[in-house]
């Protein structure tokens, strides 16, 4: 029983620190200059992006590619400028974090 409680605690700490690390990556990568989680700034809300791609089984790869290469036309006239300075691994981590923010439908 004690071992189970310790393992559960370790899992919770790991999950929490992972989410914190990914949010920190949003800050470090300057994503929050245009996006916020639940409010529209210049670009779409991050949880709105997550909701749009919720049923797309290629969403992780699609969003990671858009982070790196940029894109336009998906959100009206909004343009996502390319972010070539973001590593492939960080682009995937950012995409994974954004997809975790899906709004309740």
Question: Where in the sequence are the language-model features?
Answer:
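N-terminal signal peptide c-region/cleavage motif recognized by signal peptidases
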Residues: 15-18
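Short, solvent-exposed mixed-charge patches
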Residues: 104-105
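Hydrophobic helical h-region of N-terminal Sec-dependent signal peptides
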Residues: 8-13
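The canonical Cys-X-X-Cys-His
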Residues: 29-37, 94
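Bacterial N-terminal signal peptides that target proteins for export
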Residues: 1-7
